[in-house]
Amino acid sequence: MESIVKLKPEEFPEQLLEIPQPPKTLYIRGKLPPKDHTYLAVVGSRKYTSYGRDICEKLITGLKGYPIVIVSGLALGIDSIAHRAALKAGLVTMSFPGSGLDNNALYPRNNTALADEIVESGGCLISEFPPSMKAELYT
């Protein structure tokens, strides 16, 4: 497993420091994608329809070959579908799980292999939570 690095505010992306309450610390596993890429956030339901899945996969597959980074959470549903479609299309992804980045803390547990694949494919996982913190109701 790729090591987890603690970033200080001076290492954060500039835009993150412009929000009203930026995190004091960020943890990253993997490497940040190139800054000159376009970042596309994908969000959706955990309880998706077959139509939602098909459209998500089709849209992301159509981005193959472009300098685009797919950004999403690590939840079941559209988040996971977006990451898998992006990886299949050769795109880099970034994931923001609602937990720490240790495999023992990642939620849902059945997405630890997906998290590893994201990192191994040149993407990253980012969290403001300490590495061993498990997901809670509102994280």
Question: Where do the model's predicted regions map?
Answer:
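Glycine-biased, small-residue-rich flexible motifs in mid-sequence functional cores and linkers
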Residues: 1-139
